[in-house]
């Protein structure tokens, strides 16, 4: 898709590359019902990671003026371990933590090729 990528997506992408270096971040951009924030019932554990991430963003968005999809933050990747830095404000800290937890969740969830680019209308009611 040619939709413009939110700034923060670039950081989330780098976080995923930190925890799951063996896969392209694109593999996670269109997976299951929730990787891309959809609806319905998550198809598997990886999709549940995305559902939690979407809900996390929704909660962060309740902070006044916070748009987690666009919020940049400071973090560090060292040997596959992600750390959100202490100089983030409340919005940045929340956004960073949402992305950090999702990237860790992705690393621990099996990837099922059959759940990539699925028919959302048919499978996500």
From Swiss-Prot:
Protein EC: 3.1.1.4
Propeptide residues according to the Swiss-Prot or TrEMBL record: 2-7
Cofactor: Ca(2+)
Keyword Chaperone belongs to the record: no
Residues in the signal sequence: 1
Binding site for Ca(2+): 34, 36
Binding residue positions for Zn(2+) 2: 76
Active-site residue numbers: 53, 99
Primary localization class, coarse: secreted
Keywords: Calcium, Disulfide bond, Hydrolase, Lipid degradation, Lipid metabolism, Metal-binding, Secreted, Signal, Zinc
Cellular compartment(s): Secreted
Molecular function in Gene Ontology: calcium ion binding; calcium-dependent phospholipase A2 activity; phospholipid binding; signaling receptor binding
Tissue specificity of this protein: Expressed by the venom gland.
Binding site for Zn(2+) 1: 30, 117
Cofactor note: Binds 1 Ca(2+) ion.
GO cellular component, one term: extracellular region
SUBUNIT field: Heterodimer formed between isoform 5 and isoform 6 in presence of zinc ion and monomer in absence of zinc ion.
UniProt function note: PLA2 catalyzes the calcium-dependent hydrolysis of the 2-acyl groups in 3-sn-phosphoglycerides.
Family membership noted in the UniProt record: Belongs to the phospholipase A2 family. Group I subfamily. C49 sub-subfamily.
The protein, known as: Acidic phospholipase A2 5
Species assigned in the record: Naja sagittifera
